[in-house]
């Protein structure tokens, strides 16, 4: 089966996604430093553990696309993905079934959502584009 290209219908995405393409660095629990990427999939199993091998995406995850990204989060440490984010192939609309946040260096999954619209990334530390260190675990600047 030929690989199909997917694209976001950006007209359906809220204004806060204007920060989408800014890069953020993460100091992962194992000490490696790398960029986040978002992994989109139009397939989602019933159980998250079917997607993961340890904390790494398993080979049977049908990856639609990966995108280098910045993240939008609130003070509770939740990263929001809009319900209106959709994928299209021509005129066909394909709903997102699974989204993962992954460390590009080691492949570890930092957060995920299956048939939902948010990620819990408690205990991760994010460095934003203005070099402000934000600790989601403590809920404040550090």
How should these model regions be labeled?
Residues 1-98, 103-142:
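Small cysteine-rich, disulfide-bonded extracellular modules of the LU/uPAR three-finger superfamily
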